[in-house]
Every structure is written in C-alpha cells, then in structure tokens.
Amino acid sequence: MEGVTVKRLCTYGQFEYEKTMKALNYPSEICFDTNQFTSHESLSKFYIQNLDYLDFGDGFLVTLDDLLLINCKHIGVTFSRLREKHLNIYLKSWLRGQKEELEHVCLLASRINWEEVVPYNKEVLLKGLKYTTVSDDVERLFYCSVPDTDGKRVVAIKGGYDIRRKDGRLFTIVLQNDFPRFEMFVWSNDQ
C-alpha cells in the first residue's frame, strides 16, 4: 500500500496487528474493540509509541500500569475498571511532570450490573491534591488538537475540579455519575 497514508485505524474483531500496522505505515490514531496483542511485552511496546488518539473498546482491560505507560494525547477507555485510588496515583504522576503531550483522558467505569451504578468518590479520587472546585454553572470550551471519532475538536466542560502543576499547567477533572465517567482535560497554555 505504498503512497497511502492512514491516519486513524479502527478495528472490529480479530486482525493481525503487526502486519496491519506495518502495511498502513503505523497510524497515529487507533481504536481497538478487543485486545489484539499476543504478549504483555508487545502491548507495552505499543503503549510507549507517540500516538495522537487511542480508544479502547469494552473488550480491552486497561490497568493502572498500562495507563502510566501510554504515551498519547487522547486516551479513551470504555468500561474501565480503574477506580479512585488508581486514578489518584495517575493524577499525582502527571503532577510530577509525566505525560507532557497528554490532552484528554476519558474513562467510562464499568457497572456492577446495568441497574447498579457505582459513582466515583471525589474525596478518594482527589485525596492529597490541592484543587479548586468550579461551579457546575460555569461552562468552558476545551480545544482538542485531535478530533474525536465524530470529528469534534471542541468540548464544552461544565464545572469540575481544577488542579495546577508546579510549572503552571492546569488540568480539570470532570466526574459524571449517572454513567460513571472520569475525564481529565489538560489545558494548553494558550487556552
């Protein structure tokens, strides 16, 4: 497939990851619905690539160690099993200066069953972090360098919790509890 550039690869079902990536000249935006990797070593190598967009479907289990390894601007995980303590560790890692390219993380928490919703506990999630609560009636526009699967580049954020890193970088945590959702927005210096 010489001369063809594929920017975003979305997979559905099984396919030969290594051959496909090589043939498509390693797209920078990838959506997986299932885990295509045969070993943790190959998965770890994949995580440390410089990607723009990475979205994991419900057939993909992402651990805290995985999240800490992923080098990407946008990370999306459907049916995440990561809970408050894991995310607290991740946030503290970012505050120490890791993941400079990160712009957005969106995790949809898995439910125990479809009737029982387990919302994120803000106190556990933000434990030990200095944050400012932003009122739910305050709406801000977040500009993404990479469009989502619908092609949108602008996200309206209502409320949240602002946290500032020592170097001045600001990020906002937004928790939605009707379908437990954790989002982290890292503001660029010109927003």
Language-model features: where?
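Non-core capping and flanking segments associated with repeat-based/extracellular domains
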Residues: 1-191
